[in-house]
A protein has these predicted regions:
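N-terminal secretory signal peptides that target proteins for export/translocation
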Residues: 1-9
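Sec-dependent N-terminal signal peptides
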Residues: 9-18
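C-terminal motif of bacterial Sec signal peptides marking the signal peptidase cleavage site
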Residues: 23-27
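Short, low-complexity, glycine-enriched hydrophobic/amphipathic alpha-helices that associate
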Residues: 29-90
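Extracytoplasmic/secreted proteins, especially bacterial periplasmic and envelope-associated proteins
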Residues: 41-49, 65, 69, 84, ...
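Amphipathic, membrane-active segments
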Residues: 82-110, 114
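Periplasmic peptidoglycan-binding/anchoring modules of Gram-negative envelope and division proteins
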Residues: 94, 116-150, 177, 207, ...
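Periplasmic OmpA-like peptidoglycan-binding domain that tethers envelope proteins to the cell wall
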Residues: 151-225
């Protein structure tokens, strides 16, 4: 498991990444949630740089997914792999999380209010069964890498929230590791209060901002397999 280090190795040329990101990704509803500057950063970075920008950007899960896209028929092969996994994850997590298929990846959002007590980084025992099922499905689909990103509201100091978000992300990742998700598949980051989804001035917004997000993307092995399938059929 790495802390603060981008985890996806890119194997696609910059020019191909530019074509994919300007044609496929920009049509995705979730990608449209990124503002103009953020979209430009991904497109301008190409395949090699998109994940490098995750640490300092809003919507890190979407950045991770956007940076992993290979596009074309190979991307469609990966998409089918993700479709099956996403359907299983929806059953595993139930009301605990929102599971969304985004391009060639999966974005998952879990509310911290369900995972943790207030100001705590200890995972509630009530969600253990769901997280164990989550880990089991990740084991069944081993050719992926997972970004785990913790977020808080703005109650408390910025440093406290940064620490809490990292501790919470670590706590969820530890449940996955305990249940045999290998540590080299995980990148765990805390973002503190820096990436709010909603207005922090009222409790409904703060509740939405307290969350743990996941991005599930293809690893190099799956990308190579997808490319080989395309070549074999042609």
């Amino acid at each position: 498991m790495t802390n603060g280090v981008p985890f996806l190795k890119k194997s696609i040329a910059i020019i191909l990444a530019f074509v994919v990101l300007t044609s496929g990704i920009t049509s995705c509803n979730s990608f449209k949630k990124l503002n103009t500057q953020q979209r430009g950063a991904i497109i301008g970075a190409g395949a090699g740089g998109a994940l490098g920008a995750v640490i300092g950007q809003k919507n890190p899960a979407l950045y991770a997914i956007a940076g992993s896209v290979i596009g074309g028929v190979g991307g469609a092969v990966i998409g089918r792999y993700m479709d099956k996994q996403a359907e299983k994850l929806k059953k595993d997590l139930g009301n605990l999380a929102d599971v969304e298929r985004v391009e060639e990846g999966i974005k998952i959002t879990m509310k911290s209010g369900v995972l943790f007590d207030f100001n705590s980084s200890k995972v509630n025992s009530t969600v253990n069964d769901n997280l164990i099922k989550f880990a089991e499905t990740l084991k069944q689909y081993p050719d992926t890498e997972i970004l785990v990103a913790g977020h808080t509201d703005n109650v408390g100091t910025e440093q406290y929230n940064m620490t809490l978000s990292q501790q919470r992300a670590n706590a969820v990742a530890n449940v996955l590791k305990t249940n045999s998700v290998t540590r080299n598949r995980l990148t765990v980051l805390g973002y503190g209060e820096k990436n709010p989804l909603a207005d922090n001035t009222a409790e409904p917004g703060r509740e939405q901002n307290r969350r743990v997000e996941f991005a599930i993307v293809a690893n190099d092995k799956l990308k190579k397999q997808a490319t080989k399938e395309v070549v074999a059929k042609n």
